[in-house]
Amino acid sequence: MSRKESRSQAFQALFQLEMENTDLSIDEAINFIKDDYPDLEFDFIYWLVSGVKDHEPVLDEKIQNNLKDWKISRLLKTDRIILRMAAFELANSDTPPKVIINEAVELAKQYSDDDHYRFINGVLSNLN
């Protein structure tokens, strides 16, 4: 399956890990995906999910520095996760920034509120 679908599933795993009162581990969150999508790039998904969780405070600070008149804690959970994923990938992969930002915008169109993809695009363009 495509890297795009792998990013979507990584988003869903991170969303599950963000739920309050959950004791899920990263491995458990990813294992839920394996049953339904055995052809995904699980090395990439694990790298992305664990990287975001391991570096969350640093990613949040980097994102916060690029928010105008907003606090990261006030963002929708979906937007925070998408921004963290893209910020981590921008800093730690060889994938062209344009591709990473475009994929984040597509995730926002799929999972966030109507026009939030524009906000995601603006923040990530400033990070890059």
Curated annotation (Swiss-Prot):
* Biological process annotations from GO: DNA-templated transcription termination; transcription antitermination
Functional note: Involved in transcription antitermination. Required for transcription of ribosomal RNA (rRNA) genes. Binds specifically to the boxA antiterminator sequence of the ribosomal RNA (rrn) operons.
- To which protein family does this belong? Belongs to the NusB family.
- Top-level taxon: Bacteria
Query: What molecular functions are annotated in GO for this chain?
Result: RNA binding
Supply the HAMAP family for this chain. Answer: NusB
Q: Which protein, by its recorded name, is this?
A: Transcription antitermination protein NusB
Gene Ontology cellular-component terms for this entry are: cytosol
**Could you tell me which Gene3D superfamilies the record lists for this protein?**
NusB-like
